[in-house]
Every structure is written in C-alpha cells, then in structure tokens.
C-alpha cells in the first residue's frame, strides 16, 4: 500500500507532519495553487502513474484532487481518507472572484467551477471517508462552517462515509482524535 498525502490550497506537504509521525511516511504530493487545477492535476497523474495500491490522505482541496485522480486512475487506487474536503465547492470563492479576479484558485474552487461541477458528478468507486470538521465560524458565510468551508459542502457526497469531528479547518491535521480515525480507516486497506 502506498499512502499518498495531498495538502490543501496554499499549504505544503509539511501540513501532514503530525499525521505522518503517527501513520508513517508515504508519497508527498506538493503543488502550487497558483498553477491552476488542471496543470497540477496533470502533474499529479504523471507522478502517480507508476504506483499502485494508492490510499490518499488529503486535506481540503487535496481531497478534490484525490477524487479526480481516483476517477481517472481507478485501477491503482484503493481508497481515501479526506479531511475537511468541500466536495460541493467553497461558496466563498464565487464571491471572492470579484475581489480577486486573477486568482486561478478562486476560479477553481467555487461551486460553479468546472472542477467542482465534475467532482459533484463523480461516482466514488473506492472506500472513501471524509472527516467533516464542524467547529469554527467565518462571518463571510451564512451557513454553518468550519471557518473556511461550509459543513454542507463537506457532506455533499452521499456515497462516502462521513465522520464529524469537533475541529476547525486547520486544527484537523493536528488532532489526536483525527489521527486515530485516519489510522483506523487506513488500516482497513493493509
């Protein structure tokens, strides 16, 4: 089994250091959010094409990449555990585009983007868990949220296991309770 760690937007693989200290190292996928989803996705496909038995551990936007990768490379993927992943898109991005019109990231992650529209249509073919973070609140969102994405967006896919944790969007990668949940799910693939 190959654990593949994919970080969230504007982060690095170091965001998984605590989780990796408990689960073990794997393949770190690093990307630059400014490059655009499609360019990063192609680079990730190339990096993973010679691997097999992949289990993704991904945070936020990293989970969207994992979903698209699993859909495009189903024979080499075993499943995934994602953290705080907004499978319905990040609603705040649709508004932020007006203030940041040149941001590729904002164009990629809004619910109306092609990336998210396609993510909503993907039928999950592998065991998949999203750890839904329910603590935190951003005043820029009218729905309950974890400080970055809405809880409803994290629950968007009904064809995966959803596990709620009392963490915000950033604390999730540092939580002992989350590490235990991730470890339990990853061990099922061993």
In which residue ranges do the predicted regions lie?
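Serine-dependent carboxylesterase/thioesterase catalytic core
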Residues: 3-7, 14, 23-127, 138-139, ...
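C-terminal catalytic-base region of ester-bond hydrolases, centering on the histidine
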Residues: 11, 123-190
């Amino acid at each position: 089994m190959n654990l593949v760690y994919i970080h969230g937007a504007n982060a690095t693989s170091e965001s998984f250091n605590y989780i990796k200290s408990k689960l073990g190292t794997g393949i770190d996928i690093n990307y630059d959010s400014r490059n655009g989803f499609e360019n990063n996705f192609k680079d990730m496909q190339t990096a993973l094409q010679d691997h097999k038995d992949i289990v993704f551990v991904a945070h936020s936007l990293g989970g969207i990449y994992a979903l698209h990768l699993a859909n495009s490379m189903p024979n080499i993927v075993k499943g995934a555990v994602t953290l705080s992943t907004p499978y319905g898109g990040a609603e705040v991005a649709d508004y932020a585009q007006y203030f940041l019109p040149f941001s590729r990231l904002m164009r990629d992650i809004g619910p109306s983007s092609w990336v998210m529209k396609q993510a909503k249509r993907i039928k999950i073919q592998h065991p998949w868990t999203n750890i839904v973070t329910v603590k935190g609140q951003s005043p820029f969102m009218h729905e309950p949220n974890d400080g970055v994405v809405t809880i409803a967006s994290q629950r968007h896919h009904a064809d995966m296991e959803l596990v709620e944790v009392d963490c915000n969007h950033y604390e999730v990668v540092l939580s002992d309770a989350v590490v235990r949940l991730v470890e339990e799910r990853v061990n099922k693939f061993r």
